Amino acid sequence: MRRLKRDPLERAFLRGYQYGVHGKSRELCPFTLPSVRQAWINGWREGRGDNWDGMTGTAGIHRLNELHAVG
């Protein structure tokens, strides 16, 4: 059975979240299409907020599961 492709906006959000939670710059956004770029930046903001709240490493595992960022 073929696996369905994920929504590109969801994938962009999750990639942005990963960048944000690791403290990387917003300027590293790889997307130029406005809707996808906005989804990435929204994910980055969420990740950055979690980074500031101390949800990194093992403390942030439950948050990654909420966002389905872990398979």
Swiss-Prot record:
Coiled coil: none
Main localization category: cytoplasm
Gene3D superfamilies: ribosome modulation factor like domain
Localization per record: Cytoplasm
Keywords: Cytoplasm, Translation regulation
One Pfam family from the record: RMF
Family: Belongs to the ribosome modulation factor family.
Protein name as annotated: Ribosome modulation factor
Protein's organism: Pseudomonas savastanoi pv. phaseolicola (strain 1448A / Race 6)
